[in-house]
UniProtKB/Swiss-Prot annotation:
Main location class: cytoplasm
Active-site residue list: 73
Superkingdom as given in the UniProt entry: Bacteria
InterPro entries attached to this UniProt entry: ITPase-like_fam, Maf-like
Species in which this protein is naturally found: Anaplasma marginale (strain St. Maries)
Function: Nucleoside triphosphate pyrophosphatase. May have a dual role in cell division arrest and in preventing the incorporation of modified nucleotides into cellular nucleic acids.
GO cellular component term of the entry, any: cytoplasm
Transmembrane regions listed in the UniProt entry: none
Reactions mediated catalytically: a ribonucleoside 5'-triphosphate + H2O = a ribonucleoside 5'-phosphate + diphosphate + H(+); a 2'-deoxyribonucleoside 5'-triphosphate + H2O = a 2'-deoxyribonucleoside 5'-phosphate + diphosphate + H(+)
Protein name as annotated: Nucleoside triphosphate pyrophosphatase
EC number: 3.6.1.9
Length: 196
Protein backbone atom coordinates (compact mmCIF):
# COMPACT_ATOMS: atom_id res chain seq x y z
CA UNK A 1 0.00 0.00 0.00
CA UNK A 2 1.10 3.51 -0.77
CA UNK A 3 -0.11 6.13 1.70
CA UNK A 4 -0.27 9.44 -0.15
CA UNK A 5 -0.30 12.19 2.49
CA UNK A 6 -0.95 14.84 -0.15
CA UNK A 7 -4.15 13.14 -1.38
CA UNK A 8 -7.61 13.85 0.00
CA UNK A 9 -10.55 11.59 -0.84
CA UNK A 10 -13.65 13.79 -0.90
CA UNK A 11 -16.27 11.12 -0.30
CA UNK A 12 -18.36 9.77 2.54
CA UNK A 13 -18.50 6.32 0.89
CA UNK A 14 -16.62 3.59 2.73
CA UNK A 15 -16.80 1.58 -0.50
CA UNK A 16 -14.83 4.22 -2.42
CA UNK A 17 -12.08 4.09 0.17
CA UNK A 18 -12.01 0.27 -0.02
CA UNK A 19 -11.89 0.43 -3.83
CA UNK A 20 -9.03 2.92 -3.73
CA UNK A 21 -7.17 0.54 -1.42
CA UNK A 22 -7.65 -2.23 -4.03
CA UNK A 23 -5.24 -0.35 -6.30
CA UNK A 24 -2.83 0.05 -3.39
CA UNK A 25 -3.58 3.69 -2.59
CA UNK A 26 -4.42 5.05 0.86
CA UNK A 27 -5.28 8.76 0.93
CA UNK A 28 -3.77 10.93 3.62
CA UNK A 29 -7.22 12.20 4.50
CA UNK A 30 -10.85 11.21 3.87
CA UNK A 31 -13.50 13.90 4.19
CA UNK A 32 -17.23 14.10 3.61
CA UNK A 33 -17.91 17.21 1.52
CA UNK A 34 -20.83 19.38 2.52
CA UNK A 35 -22.38 20.27 -0.85
CA UNK A 36 -25.80 20.81 -2.40
CA UNK A 37 -26.58 17.65 -4.38
CA UNK A 38 -29.76 19.00 -5.98
CA UNK A 39 -30.39 18.11 -9.60
CA UNK A 40 -30.68 21.18 -11.82
CA UNK A 41 -33.79 21.54 -13.96
CA UNK A 42 -33.26 19.74 -17.27
CA UNK A 43 -29.83 18.42 -16.23
CA UNK A 44 -28.93 15.10 -17.85
CA UNK A 45 -27.71 12.25 -15.61
CA UNK A 46 -24.13 12.11 -16.90
CA UNK A 47 -23.65 15.88 -16.62
CA UNK A 48 -25.16 15.83 -13.13
CA UNK A 49 -22.78 13.05 -12.08
CA UNK A 50 -19.72 14.92 -13.36
CA UNK A 51 -20.88 18.16 -11.75
CA UNK A 52 -21.24 16.40 -8.39
CA UNK A 53 -17.75 14.84 -8.60
CA UNK A 54 -16.26 18.22 -9.56
CA UNK A 55 -18.23 20.07 -6.86
CA UNK A 56 -16.97 17.65 -4.19
CA UNK A 57 -13.37 18.08 -5.34
CA UNK A 58 -13.72 21.88 -5.60
CA UNK A 59 -15.32 22.21 -2.15
CA UNK A 60 -12.48 20.38 -0.43
CA UNK A 61 -9.74 21.93 -2.62
CA UNK A 62 -10.92 25.35 -1.45
CA UNK A 63 -10.12 24.25 2.13
CA UNK A 64 -6.92 22.36 1.25
CA UNK A 65 -5.24 24.21 -1.62
CA UNK A 66 -1.92 22.43 -1.06
CA UNK A 67 -3.40 18.94 -1.61
CA UNK A 68 -4.61 16.77 -4.46
CA UNK A 69 -8.34 16.21 -4.04
CA UNK A 70 -10.20 13.26 -5.53
CA UNK A 71 -13.97 13.62 -5.78
CA UNK A 72 -16.34 10.99 -7.15
CA UNK A 73 -20.05 10.51 -7.61
CA UNK A 74 -22.26 7.66 -8.79
CA UNK A 75 -25.66 8.08 -10.42
CA UNK A 76 -28.10 5.36 -11.46
CA UNK A 77 -30.63 6.31 -14.11
CA UNK A 78 -33.38 4.98 -16.38
CA UNK A 79 -33.62 7.01 -19.57
CA UNK A 80 -33.17 10.59 -18.38
CA UNK A 81 -34.59 9.91 -14.91
CA UNK A 82 -31.98 10.08 -12.16
CA UNK A 83 -32.55 7.53 -9.40
CA UNK A 84 -31.17 9.51 -6.50
CA UNK A 85 -29.70 8.20 -3.27
CA UNK A 86 -32.44 6.51 -1.29
CA UNK A 87 -33.24 7.68 2.20
CA UNK A 88 -36.63 5.97 2.68
CA UNK A 89 -37.88 2.40 2.35
CA UNK A 90 -40.75 3.53 0.13
CA UNK A 91 -38.36 5.13 -2.33
CA UNK A 92 -36.10 2.05 -2.35
CA UNK A 93 -39.08 -0.24 -3.00
CA UNK A 94 -40.26 1.99 -5.89
CA UNK A 95 -36.80 1.95 -7.45
CA UNK A 96 -36.39 -1.82 -7.13
CA UNK A 97 -39.86 -2.46 -8.56
CA UNK A 98 -39.02 -0.16 -11.47
CA UNK A 99 -35.63 -1.84 -12.06
CA UNK A 100 -36.97 -5.40 -11.77
CA UNK A 101 -36.35 -7.25 -15.05
CA UNK A 102 -35.02 -4.10 -16.70
CA UNK A 103 -31.77 -2.55 -17.80
CA UNK A 104 -30.59 0.79 -16.51
CA UNK A 105 -27.35 2.75 -16.57
CA UNK A 106 -24.91 3.67 -13.83
CA UNK A 107 -22.47 6.54 -14.31
CA UNK A 108 -19.54 7.17 -12.00
CA UNK A 109 -17.52 10.32 -12.49
CA UNK A 110 -14.12 11.03 -10.97
CA UNK A 111 -12.49 14.44 -10.62
CA UNK A 112 -8.88 14.93 -9.53
CA UNK A 113 -7.88 18.49 -8.65
CA UNK A 114 -4.17 19.26 -8.29
CA UNK A 115 -2.72 21.84 -5.87
CA UNK A 116 -2.08 24.04 -8.91
CA UNK A 117 -5.77 23.96 -9.81
CA UNK A 118 -5.45 21.58 -12.76
CA UNK A 119 -8.61 19.48 -13.08
CA UNK A 120 -8.75 15.99 -14.60
CA UNK A 121 -12.13 14.32 -15.09
CA UNK A 122 -13.33 10.92 -16.25
CA UNK A 123 -16.77 9.33 -16.46
CA UNK A 124 -17.64 5.67 -16.92
CA UNK A 125 -21.12 4.54 -17.91
CA UNK A 126 -22.12 0.90 -17.38
CA UNK A 127 -25.34 -1.00 -18.04
CA UNK A 128 -26.92 -3.11 -15.30
CA UNK A 129 -29.80 -5.58 -15.69
CA UNK A 130 -31.73 -6.88 -12.72
CA UNK A 131 -33.53 -10.21 -12.85
CA UNK A 132 -37.29 -10.12 -12.45
CA UNK A 133 -37.44 -9.86 -8.68
CA UNK A 134 -40.15 -11.43 -6.56
CA UNK A 135 -41.91 -9.41 -3.90
CA UNK A 136 -40.12 -11.58 -1.32
CA UNK A 137 -36.70 -10.79 -2.78
CA UNK A 138 -37.43 -7.08 -2.72
CA UNK A 139 -38.73 -7.30 0.86
CA UNK A 140 -35.65 -9.25 1.95
CA UNK A 141 -33.35 -6.72 0.34
CA UNK A 142 -35.23 -3.82 1.96
CA UNK A 143 -35.01 -5.54 5.37
CA UNK A 144 -31.21 -5.77 4.98
CA UNK A 145 -30.92 -1.96 5.00
CA UNK A 146 -28.30 -2.15 2.24
CA UNK A 147 -30.33 0.29 0.12
CA UNK A 148 -29.72 3.27 2.43
CA UNK A 149 -27.92 6.14 0.76
CA UNK A 150 -27.37 4.18 -2.46
CA UNK A 151 -27.93 5.54 -5.96
CA UNK A 152 -30.86 3.61 -7.40
CA UNK A 153 -31.59 2.00 -4.04
CA UNK A 154 -28.95 -0.71 -4.26
CA UNK A 155 -25.27 -1.46 -3.91
CA UNK A 156 -23.83 -4.13 -6.21
CA UNK A 157 -21.37 -5.13 -3.45
CA UNK A 158 -24.08 -6.60 -1.24
CA UNK A 159 -27.07 -8.91 -1.64
CA UNK A 160 -28.27 -6.89 -4.65
CA UNK A 161 -25.37 -8.42 -6.58
CA UNK A 162 -27.26 -11.74 -6.46
CA UNK A 163 -30.25 -10.07 -8.12
CA UNK A 164 -28.28 -8.66 -11.05
CA UNK A 165 -28.44 -10.83 -14.20
CA UNK A 166 -25.58 -9.13 -16.01
CA UNK A 167 -23.57 -5.97 -16.36
CA UNK A 168 -21.87 -4.37 -19.32
CA UNK A 169 -19.02 -2.09 -18.35
CA UNK A 170 -17.02 -1.66 -15.17
CA UNK A 171 -17.95 -3.48 -11.95
CA UNK A 172 -15.77 -1.14 -9.89
CA UNK A 173 -17.47 1.88 -11.44
CA UNK A 174 -20.91 0.51 -10.54
CA UNK A 175 -19.57 -0.08 -7.01
CA UNK A 176 -18.52 3.59 -6.81
CA UNK A 177 -15.03 4.14 -8.26
CA UNK A 178 -13.75 3.18 -11.73
CA UNK A 179 -10.39 1.68 -10.81
CA UNK A 180 -8.68 1.83 -14.20
CA UNK A 181 -9.53 5.49 -14.75
CA UNK A 182 -8.65 6.43 -11.17
CA UNK A 183 -5.33 4.59 -11.39
CA UNK A 184 -4.50 6.44 -14.62
CA UNK A 185 -5.42 9.84 -13.14
CA UNK A 186 -3.37 9.30 -9.98
CA UNK A 187 -0.52 7.72 -11.96
CA UNK A 188 -0.07 11.02 -13.77
CA UNK A 189 1.13 12.55 -10.48
CA UNK A 190 2.22 9.70 -8.22
CA UNK A 191 4.53 6.73 -8.82
CA UNK A 192 2.08 3.84 -8.59
CA UNK A 193 4.11 1.37 -10.66
CA UNK A 194 5.74 -0.24 -7.64
CA UNK A 195 2.41 -1.23 -6.13
CA UNK A 196 2.01 -5.02 -6.55
Amino acid sequence: MLKIEGLVLASSSKYRLALLEQIGVVPGEVVSPNIDESLLKGELPRRYCMRMARTKADAEAALRSDKFVLGADTVAYCGKRVLSKTESEDCAVRYLEMLSGRRHRVCTSVCLRSPGGIVHERSVVSVVKFKSMSKGEIEYYISSGQWRGKAGGYGIQGFAGALISWIQGSYSSIAGLPLHETYCLLGGYFDLKHIP
